[in-house]
């Protein structure tokens, strides 16, 4: 088996690029891409390193999208091997970012190099949109690059995001959409006082519980053939001073919606506000829009990806919209078709993150085949 993908993945993993750090990962990638004719455009916004790279000047534009940052390691004592010293054990490459998503980045680069060597005069353009701010607050990453591209009317036709989409084996699942994400930060106001004198206080916890119960039990929608029903989850709740004899003066609650295309963020906000008002709460609330839902239906990108996976692996892929959000949510509103295809996600964000070594070569072959189907017609 050719080990080019594994060696590049190891080089990337060895760089401790905990978000928003890049630690030279993009420079490594840029040097490889420049050598095969890409124009490299670094885009640094505050603490975030981004890269837009492009080979070709005409449509259609196929873009590989991904991130060089990784989540923190967690307890180092629980790792079998140092997280930034990539190690192969029983045919699995271990290290932080192996599956999310430095293995994918390596497969993208190798696939691109092989494709360009075989098809130097390919149709359209190949691009890369890479950020070091996907695992963090996602303020100065892909969103800022998209804003820059939109301002000069530079569009992508197709975007393939290297997120670890697979469930049991490489390519068994691709993500052809994602639910929207909306976070609410609620503060319920009361009056602090002594628990022995409740008539002189106003307990915000007691007042909020019925409203929160109604929100938690609410049926928001039925979903559809592509998306499960909208989910409401309380993520954090805090109230009280820690003392047993003090009624708190306020209660704070953070909750999140993962919502389908059957409802809008605006509709969810109106329904939440109506419930809070109906319970007579004195409250303040602010909203964080994390991303709109998107869906890529049948079309050139999904068709090419299905065919490529079938030809390389021998089995069919299953397009799904489950799971968390990705930077695909920022690309989709530009009008590009967006898919996610990457390694098995069983160990992502965990200690002892790893990826099957053979899967990296399979992934590179899938990526190369997709390029051929879209840019060699």
UniProtKB/Swiss-Prot annotation:
The active site is at residues 69, 134. One of its GO terms (biological process) is lysine biosynthetic process via diaminopimelate. GO terms for molecular function: acetylornithine deacetylase activity; cobalt ion binding; succinyl-diaminopimelate desuccinylase activity; zinc ion binding. Zn(2+) 1 binds at residues 67, 100, 163. The gene is dapE. It comes from Shewanella frigidimarina (strain NCIMB 400). Binds 2 Zn(2+) or Co(2+) ions per subunit. Belongs to the peptidase M20A family. DapE subfamily. The keyword Cytoplasm does not apply. This is Succinyl-diaminopimelate desuccinylase. It comes from the Bacteria. Catalyzes the hydrolysis of N-succinyl-L,L-diaminopimelic acid (SDAP), forming succinate and LL-2,6-diaminopimelate (DAP), an intermediate involved in the bacterial biosynthesis of lysine and meso-diaminopimelic acid, an essential component of bacterial cell walls. Homodimer. Its cofactor is Zn(2+); Co(2+). It catalyses: N-succinyl-(2S,6S)-2,6-diaminopimelate + H2O = (2S,6S)-2,6-diaminopimelate + succinate. Zn(2+) 2 binds at residues 100, 135, 349. It is an enzyme of class 3 (hydrolase).
């Amino acid at each position: 088996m050719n080990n080019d993908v594994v060696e590049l993945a190891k080089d990337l993993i060895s760089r401790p690029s905990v978000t928003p750090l890049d630690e030279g990962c993009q420079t490594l990638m840029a040097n490889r891409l420049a050598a095969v004719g890409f124009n490299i455009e670094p885009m640094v916004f505050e603490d975030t390193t981004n890269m837009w790279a492009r080979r070709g000047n005409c449509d259609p534009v196929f873009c590989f999208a991904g991130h060089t940052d990784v989540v923190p390691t967690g307890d180092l004592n629980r790792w079998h091997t140092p997280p930034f010293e990539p190690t192969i054990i029983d045919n699995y490459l271990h290290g932080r970012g192996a599956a999310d998503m430095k293995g994918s980045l390596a497969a993208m680069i190798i696939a691109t190099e092989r494709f360009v060597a075989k098809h130097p005069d390919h149709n359209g353009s190949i691009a890369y949109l890479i950020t070091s701010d996907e695992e963090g607050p996602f303020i100065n990453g892909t969103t800022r690059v998209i804003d820059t591209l939109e301002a000069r009317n530079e569009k992508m036709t197709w975007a393939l995001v290297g997120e670890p989409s697979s469930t049991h084996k490489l390519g068994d699942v691709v993500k052809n959409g994602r639910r929207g994400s909306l976070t609410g930060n609620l503060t319920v106001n009361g009056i602090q006082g002594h628990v022995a004198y409740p008539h002189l206080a106003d307990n915000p916890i007691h007042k909020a519980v019925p409203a929160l119960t109604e929100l938690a039990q609410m049926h928001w929608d039925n979903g559809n053939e592509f998306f499960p029903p909208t989910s409401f989850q309380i993520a954090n709740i805090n109230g009280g001073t820690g003392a047993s004899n003090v009624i708190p003066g306020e209660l704070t609650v953070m909750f999140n919606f993962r919502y389908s295309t059957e409802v809008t963020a605006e509709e969810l906000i109106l329904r939440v506000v109506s419930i809070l008002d109906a319970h007579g709460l004195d409250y303040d609330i602010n909203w964080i829009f994390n991303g709109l839902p998107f869906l890529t239906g049948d079309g050139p990108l999904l068709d090419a990806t299905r065919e490529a996976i079938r030809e390389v692996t021998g089995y069919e892929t299953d397009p799904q919209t489950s799971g968390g959000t990705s930077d695909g949510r920022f690309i989709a509103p530009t009008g590009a078709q967006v898919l996610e295809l990457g390694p098995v996600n069983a160990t992502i964000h965990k200690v002892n993150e790893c990826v099957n070594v053979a899967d990296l070569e399979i992934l590179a072959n899938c990526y190369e085949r997709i390029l051929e189907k879209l840019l060699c017609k």
